[in-house]
Amino acid sequence: MLFAILAIVSYAQNGVIRGTVTDEIGLGLPGANVIIESLTIGASTDVNGNFTLKNVPTGTQEVAVTFLGYATSISTVTVEDGETVVLNVSLKPGVLIGEEVLVLGDRLKGQAKALNQQKNKSNITNIVAADQIGRFPDANVGDAMKRIPGITMQGDQGEARNIIVRGLAPQLNSVMINGERIPSAEGDNRNIQMDLIPSDMIQTIEVNKAVTPDMDADAIGGAVNLVTRAASSGMRISGTAASGMNLLTNKPIWTGSLVYGNRFADDKIGLVVSANYNNHDFGSDNVEAEWEATAEDANGDDFDLVYVGEMDIRQYYVQRVRRSVSANLDFKLDENNTIYVQTMYNWRDDWENRYRTTYRKIAPTFDANGDINGWEGEMRRQTKAGGTIYNDRVKDRRLEDQRVLNGTVRGEHLFGNLDLNWSFTAAKASEERPFERYIRYEQGDGLPFNYDINNTEFPSFTAVNPADVAVGMFTFDELTEENQYTEEMDYNGRIDLSLPTVIADNTGEVKAGFRYRGKQKNRANNFFEYAPLGSNLDDMSLVANEDYSKDNYLAGDYNVGTFVTPEYLAQLDLHNETLFEGQEVPSEYLAGNYEANEAILGGYLMWNQDLTDKLAILAGVRVENTAISYVGNVVENEEDLIRQEKGEQNYTNVLPGIHLKYDATDDFIIRAAWTNTLARPNYFNLVPFQDIRPDDEELIKGNANLNPTTSMNFDIMAENYFKSIGLVSAGAFYKNINDFIYTFVDENYVDADITGGNEWTFFQPQNGGSAVLYGAEVAFQRQLDFLPGFWKGFGVYFNYTYTNSTTEGIRNGDGELRTDVALPGTAPHLVNGSLSYENEKLVVRASINYAHDYVDEVGGSAFSDRYYDRQMFVDVNASYAFTENLRLFVEANNLTNQPLRYYQGVRERTMQLEYYNARFNVGLKFDMFKK
């Protein structure tokens, strides 16, 4: 194949046409078609609006530029042998509909940019532009992405954090910034926290659902590329200033953003700087429950009984501050050589207090006849805070400090007909939790409870005798301080080469490249327990305390109760040996500490060729070699380290792929793809650690023998684009997955050396057998401009995704194969919809986002499986343009007060229920020097 391709590569040193296509205000237009129709030579502009036409015959040529929603431009240039001609084109908005010229409003221009890119891609992709992101009230990239077909998100404290693409869990997808991978600040997995990045910082979101050979292969669900802003053709300053309120805490939200862009030195240097600040003081009302299937009778024998064995009532108060800065430079050395410098820094602080009431060791009591006559257990109250006495930044709260810094230098060079592109990226992600403190008081075993299980979605416990839970009845149990730190460093490099090809007057290119990805990850935590040397902490009445119960607890009729205040806990001088005796507790952290190093070498060969004026093929193969080494800790008991265990893996994957694109008409496109992808195990899953927890009767092990998950994928998609800006599409997908990874759970594990003959619970990540995932997507978006008068201002945005999956190879605790389990993350139904109205000044939009419930984590049996419950979010936003440069906007999120809910086994058994309430924002957007 290689020699056949090289035989038809055109080496004639004719000429080259290069340039940039911009809109009327100087912003690059991505996805524009640039073509010399008489020669069938053409190209699409990149994300910044740049294009290159190679191997152009000498002489006078007419170059046509087309873009959805914009008038076609035709330019005449003279091409000389071996020379590069620069052609910059500025398009004007307007499209001929019948005999009427429709001029796009500002709100539709962003949609036009996204649809043009999507239309001209060789692979199946969804693209959302910055202007379109701004049409929804989404503060971070995660919330913006849940509007895209086939994507659902898992939330944290009411914000979208982890991405699920086409029913595949976060670790089966990849996330990039400007085409380069970014490291993860998560301690034990590869997930990228999408709520770390404000949506204002992004110019374009690309979701590649069928990857091409020149992309990293570890993207079974999809590869997400976040493209930051590029410099416009002239000076531009835009920004946002807003404030709002969260109804759970009734505290303000502050948001600000600023973008500056310009070109200097006769347009040879471009600069764009973006900054964003968001300060959100919020919280959540939470209950959590663990359900049991058996209990002990009066004789100590097990019998079947479904009940809550442990339950928490939790009150969270969180202040989340996001700061992001991005600076991008481009240097046009000459018409054939450009250097880019791209940087981005994201920093998020979460300050959190949590008040946690726990009912535990719950068990039935029996009368003389052996019938249940009541319930008893133990009650605990715990405060979470931070050691402000040693670090002012923690502010009496637990501080989670997450930062991601990435910088890329890349070059684009043209030597005759040879394109040479290269890049080098260095990136660092870190998460630090300094001086995290917990203090716990308890009311001991045998406390009688009233247990209300009439509604299993809202189980509740109360003390039979209220005097038993008075403040003075809670005695000191535990006081701890811990420090957590996770760091990941990435060093990535690539070289890509491409040459034009011609077959029977149909153009194409052959492309080859080499890729290196190096990664270093480590987690270094510690944990200390402190005992007071005096009696001044003996019971809760002796210390500063406060009742944090509230009348309108959103999770149900619960009272969280009285706790030690975080201010008191924060100022305890735990390191003073005259006041406290400290002891390190290795069992709480040592097994979780590890080091991992990963090196991935990749190469590819790819041919992208027009076979006719309607049919194009992209075919190629990618080869990736993975080498991983890691060090983990084997812990014998709660205090002793046996040894450090080392391990390594080395494997190679060969991953061919074919993409077909058929342009039935100028606006109707059919795509099909066969691809092969993989997902590497989470780092911590590979670490050969052992964690023995006698108090909990649990044994947890890593698995150095895990194989990577591989998938063969088939996709088909049909798209019809409307000239008046819109799209209707339908497609289907099928994935044959091997060696998927799940957590094996044995609830009756016995090991004479470890458990002493008792039955413990054993956890270990293992490879399953095979899985099949399939589904379908439909999407429709259009401004209803064909309607008369007032009605033409309405617009519709809708998409629906169906997914289903089956698995083979998941075993229960008895070693039996389970046949009733879907892949975690497979939500059967996803729906997005919005109805909007806009005229020259006013825009109003109401939107919904719905995700059906799905398996989130496989347990030891169907009874223990954890499900992520269905969710439906309703948001409304509106804006009014005072001038072309100034717009007022109003946003309302989560108007239905949609909670986060997990359930255990069946929907009636609540496992976690967490409410956040609605939030509102109002502000101004400005765009200065807009032409």
Give the location of each predicted region.
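N-terminal periplasmic accessory domains that precede
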Residues: 85-89, 141-144, 161-164, 176, ...
